[in-house]
Amino acid sequence: MIAQLSTVAPSANYPEFLEALRNSGFRGQISADYATRTVLATDNSIYQRLPQAAVFPLDADDVARVATLMGEPRFQQVKLTPRGGGTGTNGQSLTDGIVVDLSRHMNNILEINVEERWVRVQAGTVKDQLNAALKPHGLFFAPELSTSNRATVGGMINTDASGQGSCTYGKTRDHVLELHSVLLGGERLHSLPIDDAALEQACAAPGRVGEVYRMAREIQETQAELIETTFPKLNRCLTGYDLAHLRDEQGRFNLNSVLCGAEGSLGYVVEAKLNVLPIPKYAVLVNVRYTSFMDALRDANALMAHKPLSIETVDSKVLMLAMKDIVWHSVAEYFPADPERPTLGINLVEFCGDEPAEVNAKVQAFIQHLQSDTSVERLGHTLAEGAEAVTRVYTMRKRSVGLLGNVEGEVRPQPFVEDTAVPPEQLADYIADFRALLDGYGLAYGMFGHVDAGVLHVRPALDMKDPVQAALVKPISDAVAALTKRYGGLLWGEHGKGLRSEYVPEYFGELYPALQRLKGAFDPHNQLNPGKICTPLGSAEGLTPVDGVTLRGDLDRTIDERVWQDFPSAVHCNGNGACYNYDPNDAMCPSWKATRERQHSPKGRASLMREWLRLQGEANIDVLAAARNKVSWLKGLPARLRNNRARNQGQEDFSHEVYDAMAGCLACKSCAGQCPIKVNVPDFRSRFLELYHGRYQRPLRDYLIGSLEFTIPYLAHAPGLYNAVMGSKWVSQLLADKVGMVDSPLISRFNFQATLTRCRVGMATVPALRELTPAQRERSIVLVQDAFTRYFETPLLSAFIDLAHRLGHRVFLAPYSANGKPLHVQGFLGAFAKAAIRNATQLKALADCGVPLVGLDPAMTLVYRQEYQKVPGLEGCPKVLLPQEWLMDVLPEQAPAAPGSFRLMAHCTEKTNVPASTRQWEQVFARLGLKLVTEATGCCGMSGTYGHEARNQETSRTIFEQSWATKLDKDGEPLATGYSCRSQVKRMTERKMRHPLEVVLQYAQR
């Protein structure tokens, strides 16, 4: 049995601060629970710092309430750090104080001025969210990031983020027109470029605002020569406290130059007015392939002479990982493989403009250069033409940061020297020395980045659980800092300083005290994100050294090796945050999108699972043994009931917090398919539930869900009685109140036997299949039944049989056998294993007869390919085809059918775990002369039985309204492949959606 787990309480003074904040009128959430703190202890870096608490302001007034309290003498020891998307690679948002998360509520687009091309947004607005709102106006916010679907504008400002296209579009700072910030003590600062008269007024202002203006002006006037010689002339100039740009090109004084990139160490940016640009109307991406990565780098200078928008580079390691990723099927055509001459580097060279003729002329001139120049060895090039094609390739490039974390084994590329910048003309030589440095340590590495800007993301591969390898972080950081300085570059070229700030004093030299004085004017007691960039002059506290912070690996290594090897997807989550994608029309992750609570995301759940495993180990519990050595249900009942009573009486147990996070998971498996690291939450969720309910008694609801597949065949003998009982108001109310189940489906009252007779359907038995001749086997299939389409949607099962019959195939019906998916979802893993072994044995015997197996519902069918393969003792399971996979082999081309357009709204599990599936449906329809377009959708909110659980009603509806509800009434009939999706639409709208099979049956010729 697992242990009851106590947790670390917040340190002294923090509970008092939080109580004072509650009493101040703060309207957002205040969370000091261990789950929230654990999830916010990591970002996309190698570090882990447990905060004391987290606060989620509702608006700028809430931020001011926090800052006002901070200014009181009694709370001078309280530290605060802002957090946006949590995508930083250097620990910028990590703290052992309080996290101020601006992303949950302060994420509104306040104003769009199309004529003057500017927007006003709150700090928590996600970059892609902003660009989606701007797109109808033909505008966009320019700085392009690989994390743009979860990075917030506030985070971009705080790190002065840049990325692809920065040589053309500049950095975030170049697009900031005005900022609204809250300073320590609660004062508001409205900063924008001002002339000297306005500067005099600002310096004369009372309080902290006047103080910071006076200090900034003094530094700018007295240190001008030192500033000029210290700040490098690079596209990626120094971020944070950028004294070199306190005066802009028009001579105006702009305090935003020091606020951009300050990482929240000077104040809290709550709102920004931003410059936006017209979207280029036409784009072409030239994808150039090389025989070596160094050739790709050395070629960059010559390519830049053609003035492209940008040049992005990717090495072979990243390219090989991309080939195994969900995204590859959409871009493979642009990177043809040649086994004799493998591609070891690529440059993605973009040209864009408003006139296709002008863009194409530039592209042709560029191609002529490629064909005539022999200075490097190129393998060839391809063109991605138009916005849609260019976006597909860039999506692959954007996933590089996550893909590098998905190498096999424990030695994985780590971010700690990954954003160095040098003059572009020095890049190839610099990288040669960088590679020699890493080669000297015997390390592998992956590289990608912005060669036009002289920035390459380099991630040395280390097993951070190995203390010997983890100890290399400091000497490598020291060596790379020295190397960049030798080449006239920067250690911090793009991702901010964060916990690499110890190199700041050496770099700034005599100018560093000026930074300290500026910090002191904003934050005299070092309370705002302390230890980063600089400390106030005279402060006893220093900068946090690279090796002075707990590493994630330091804690991971305390987990028993057998345990972390058995839970790889939880341990290997690297925090890239792809699951924080804001887009409601992206499948991953529906519970995060609906709640905006980070523990309800794959990253959050992986963090909690990792910490739970660690704490169980500290309590001397072997979770693997606990899973193996389960006591009988009856024997363990008294202990479970005692533990339930203790839980209800308020006994602390971190397991309850983990359970709450796992219970919120829809088990849609989008994370297993979409996450670059392939974090599979449903897998370790089921294992956790099994262990948790070894200590705590399950609710009756779990048993009803788990047994559904086994009981429904018997209940189906009396469908009228079952439907009358389940459809009655008093039974529905009883189930909702006492069991926690709502909107239970009713059994189909359909004459299935008539279909079986009409289409001469036989039972699939080994003797029956062996009697078939080879020719007959080629024209036969075995239909594998699932509980949902068989008993709750029988007309669809009948439609498939009719379709197969029309196509000249005889259907054999596999004997009904419980698939086991509901058991797996609820954590009944012992019962699931028995069902899987029994079912797989039966299916293997049938498959050995040489007749293909086909299943209807994607979520149920894919269990045979995924969950079954992990069952101990199960020697494989034959592949059960999805309907479209089978139709691709048997459906002939025919004359165009009647005109009509259809839209496919695919099941989350299907489209994320079998990416080719939606394209296959499109091809099936094309063979009938029909047009089918795959609709971009998120989750429908049902996901099996999730939407039927009373505790999930509100979230289920929210998820449905975020995406599916907005798509149903567009032109073209919507079609859904998932039983649960069709059920949700019917429940929410009283509308019946068809399965694509029903349309194929309608139009397929006899």
UniProtKB/Swiss-Prot annotation:
Keywords of this entry: 4Fe-4S, FAD, Flavoprotein, Iron, Iron-sulfur, Metal-binding, Oxidoreductase
Disrupted-gene phenotype: Deletion mutant cannot grow on D-lysine as a sole carbon source and shows attenuated growth on L-lysine. Mutant accumulates D-2-hydroxyglutarate.
Residue ranges of domain FAD-binding PCMH-type in the record: 47-279
UniProt binding sites for [4Fe-4S] cluster: 665, 668, 671, 675
Cofactor note: Binds 1 [4Fe-4S] cluster.
UniProt GO MF annotations: 4 iron, 4 sulfur cluster binding; D-lactate dehydrogenase (cytochrome) activity; D-lactate dehydrogenase activity; FAD binding; metal ion binding
Pathway assigned in UniProt: Amino-acid degradation
Chain residues that bind (R)-2-hydroxyglutarate: 397, 495
Gene induction: Up-regulated when grown on L-lysine, D-lysine or 2-aminoadipate.
Signal sequence region: none
Cofactor needs: [4Fe-4S] cluster; FAD
Gene3D superfamilies: 3.30.465.10, 3.30.70.2740
Entries under SUPFAM superfamilies matching the protein: alpha-helical ferredoxin, FAD-binding/transporter-associated domain-like, FAD-linked oxidases, C-terminal domain
Leading EC class: oxidoreductase
4Fe-4S ferredoxin-type domain: residues covered: 655-687
Single GO BP term: lactate catabolic process
Catalysed reactions, as listed in the record: (R)-2-hydroxyglutarate + A = 2-oxoglutarate + AH2
Documented EC number(s): 1.1.99.39
PANTHER family in UniProt: D-2-HYDROXYGLUTARATE DEHYDROGENASE (PTHR11748:SF119), D-LACTATE DEHYDROGENASE (PTHR11748)
Family the UniProt entry places it in: In the N-terminal section; belongs to the FAD-binding oxidoreductase/transferase type 4 family.
Function text: Catalyzes the oxidation of D-2-hydroxyglutarate (D-2-HGA) to 2-oxoglutarate. Is involved in a D-lysine catabolic pathway.
Name under which the protein is recorded: D-2-hydroxyglutarate dehydrogenase
Native source species: Pseudomonas putida (strain ATCC 47054 / DSM 6125 / CFBP 8728 / NCIMB 11950 / KT2440)
Name of the encoding gene: ydiJ
